[in-house]
Regions:
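Membrane-anchoring alpha-helices and their flanking helix-loop junctions
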Residues: 1-55, 67-127
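Solvent-exposed interhelical
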Residues: 58
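Extended, alpha-helix-rich binding/interface surfaces that flank or overlap catalytic cores
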Residues: 63
């Protein structure tokens, strides 16, 4: 038996689509900021970053690409309208924070020192 959250199909699809679109836009904005700064986008090698990107979308969130993925997952959950699917974005956020973001932050702190510390104080991790 599937439990569904009551919401008009059209309204749900519009909301889901808007969330997915917002997530894609965030991801693209993050990618373009890295390309503009001519630095690596490889999440497995944050120590290879040649520049600390703090402009554009990075003025509002330190992790627009991960935030974009979480919002896409939220859009998918809204589209499916099944309560268990809403765990996806939460679990993704917890996992990516522990196993990707925190290690990236350590590498960036080691590489950029006080500049990264000031950025970290100024801009939130997610929102």
């Amino acid at each position: 038996m599937t439990v569904r959250i009551p919401m008009g199909v059209v309204a749900r699809e519009i909301l889901a689509g808007a969330l997915v679109l917002a997530g894609v836009v965030l991801g693209i904005a993050g990618t373009l900021a890295f390309r503009s700064a001519q630095t690596t986008i490889d999440p497995h090698r944050p120590e290879a970053a040649s520049t600390l990107v703090v402009d554009g979308i990075y003025r509002f969130t330190r992790n627009p690409m991960y935030l974009g993925l979480a919002i896409i997952l939220l859009g998918w959950a809204v589209y499916l309208a099944a309560p268990p699917t809403f765990a996806g974005p939460v679990l993704f956020g917890l996992y990516i924070t522990a196993f990707q973001i925190v290690p990236e932050e350590r590498a960036l702190a080691a590489k950029f020192g006080p500049e990264y510390a000031a950025y970290r104080e100024r801009v939130r991790r997610w929102l």
